[in-house]
Amino acid sequence: MRTRILHRWKTVCLGGLLGFSSLCAQAEGIGYTPTPENLQARKEFQDGKFGIFLHWGIYSMFGQGEWYMNTANIDCHEYAKAASGFYPSRFNAQEWVAAIKASGAKYICITSRHHDGFSMFDTKYSDYDIVDATPFKRDVIKELAEECRKQGIRLHLYYSHLDWTREDYYPLGNTGHGTGRTSHGEWATYYQFMNHQLTELLTNYGPIGAIWFDGMWDQPDGFDWKLEEQYKLIHKLQPACLIGNNHHKTPYPGEDFQMFERDLPGENKAGLSGQSVSALPLE
């Protein structure tokens, strides 16, 4: 999520999210037909109206917002050293979920991996994660997932498309130029890495209500993110899992709801074309 929102969402933040939703099939016409369980999940998401967003990562320790690595031009190797001091000893999934549920929220969305590239779950495709790189050694996403199931609240996962640390995130986009990454790389391996992680999240953590993508705006228009293949993977693994993408464009086939940042649905201050945007559930 972009740095301009930092004054509104402090890290770690609890952002209340109101869903302004309508059910329709605008983005389904080309190559995507949602399953009955997906349509039911859309209805439940629309009816839920209110969720809580947990923006949490090693950036939280700096108190400078989630874009600190980029805005301060911190070398990715120096930034990664912060993981050795990340020990959220007071984290209690049962208490967090209970408090959120008591607020009336119907779902929780948490950053599984933000733009700094640090994974808040135990992944076998990188050592740069909360289990392998920190003294905490606990998978907070798994603990939250288990507690959400116990308490009857849905878990959504935010996942960044861009990465300021990995060398295979190339070509470099509009951000992260001061983080010490290489000037060359292999996009195909990065794309494979993302899909491997998404497979882990949708296989090892039980039912996931939605995947919230962010960062597509880092690359110029026309860049091939291979969204169709990625979205098909998600819906194959969990047909009821909803997909949203913070790109502020007309929805792509495979997306089940639309999210807005620095905007309220209907105001369109962020430059969305305005064409057919009311055809999907809006967040």
Name every feature range the model reports, one short phrase each.
Residues 10, 17-19, 44, 235:
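A generic structural signal for short, solvent-exposed coil/turn residues
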Residues 1-3, 19, 35, 42:
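Helix-centric, low-specificity signal for extended rod-like, repetitive segments
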